């Protein structure tokens, strides 16, 4: 049995057509089903529907053989027990700092609100900047507006939400896309099967990119 961990939303929507190229199609619509384990048209392949931030954990611990996770999630939660063989070039966005439009650069210790705590610590450590990290799980844009933080670090797609709240994107930390990740033990035990899937997905990505 080959188990693939996916999260609902943009990543799932963009991944399903790629899996279909490999003949892997869910037997019911994951967006409408309440099931978290979904069979596919291949009897020995199933999908696990999990939170985006949990995909690396499921794969690393062998609960799933493969998964699809955003690079932002992999940067934050680590991927030491994973192979990352393929950039699927889907769900593309940017991980950036942002602050109030026109606000002067704060002097001294910086207050940064984000859910990407580990990324923020590494980023500012590399700059030699002292920061206080404030962990939030949502509505990041609010933090600078009410003086909870000087800046935020968040995923930016169009930037419309930032602008609607009087903020502007500032420093680019990383360009983000979703990656195929593979459990190391699974890669050894089911090497031919998984490598064939990787190759098929790579061809699908390249074909789509050329198109």
Swiss-Prot record:
Family recorded in the similarity comment: Belongs to the ATP phosphoribosyltransferase family. Short subfamily.
Transcription keyword on record: no
Domain of life where this protein originates: Bacteria
Any Gene Ontology biological process: L-histidine biosynthetic process
InterPro entries (UniProt xref): ATP_PRibTrfase_cat, ATP_PRibTrfase_CS, ATP_PRibTrfase_HisG, ATP_PRibTrfase_HisG_short
Leading EC class: transferase
Alphabetical list of PANTHER family matching this protein: ATP PHOSPHORIBOSYLTRANSFERASE (PTHR21403:SF8), ATP PHOSPHORIBOSYLTRANSFERASE ATP-PRTASE (PTHR21403)
PROSITE patterns reported in the protein's UniProt record: ATP_P_PHORIBOSYLTR
Enzyme Commission numbers on file: 2.4.2.17
Protein name (record): ATP phosphoribosyltransferase
GO MF term list: ATP binding; ATP phosphoribosyltransferase activity
Function: Catalyzes the condensation of ATP and 5-phosphoribose 1-diphosphate to form N'-(5'-phosphoribosyl)-ATP (PR-ATP). Has a crucial role in the pathway because the rate of histidine biosynthesis seems to be controlled primarily by regulation of HisG enzymatic activity.
Catalytic reaction(s) noted: 1-(5-phospho-beta-D-ribosyl)-ATP + diphosphate = 5-phospho-alpha-D-ribose 1-diphosphate + ATP
Keyword terms of this UniProt record: Amino-acid biosynthesis, ATP-binding, Cytoplasm, Glycosyltransferase, Histidine biosynthesis, Nucleotide-binding, Transferase
SUPFAM superfamilies hit by this protein: Periplasmic binding protein-like II (SSF53850)
Pathway where this protein functions: Amino-acid biosynthesis; L-histidine biosynthesis; L-histidine from 5-phospho-alpha-D-ribose 1-diphosphate: step 1/9
Location relative to the cell: Cytoplasm
Subunit structure: Heteromultimer composed of HisG and HisZ subunits.
One Pfam assignment: HisG
Gene3D superfamilies on file: Periplasmic binding protein-like II
Record has DNA damage as a keyword: no
This protein's domain notes: Lacks the C-terminal regulatory region which is replaced by HisZ.
Any one of the GO CC terms: cytoplasm
């Amino acid at each position: 049995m080959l188990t693939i961990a996916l999260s609902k939303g943009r990543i799932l929507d963009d991944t399903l057509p790629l899996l279909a190229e490999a003949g892997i199609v869910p037997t019911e619509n994951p967006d409408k089903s309440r099931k978290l384990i979904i069979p596919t048209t291949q009897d020995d392949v199933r999908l696990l529907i999990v939170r985006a931030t949990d995909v690396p954990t499921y794969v690393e611990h062998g609960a799933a053989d493969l998964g699809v996770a955003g690079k932002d999630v992999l940067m934050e939660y680590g991927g030491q027990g994973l192979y990352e063989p393929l950039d699927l070039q889907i769900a593309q966005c940017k991980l950036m700092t942002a602050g109030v439009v026109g606000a002067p650069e704060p002097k001294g210790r910086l207050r940064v609100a984000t859910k990407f705590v580990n990324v923020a610590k590494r980023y500012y450590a590399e700059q030699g900047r002292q920061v206080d990290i404030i962990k939030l799980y949502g509505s990041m844009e609010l933090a600078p507006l009410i003086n909870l933080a000087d800046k935020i670090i968040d995923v930016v797609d169009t930037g419309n939400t930032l602008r609607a709240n009087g903020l502007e994107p500032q420093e680019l930390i990383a360009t983000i896309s979703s990656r195929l990740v593979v459990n190391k033990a699974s890669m050894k035990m089911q090497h031919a099967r998984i490598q064939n899937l990787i190759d098929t997905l790579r061809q699908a990505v390249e074909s789509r990119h050329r198109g």
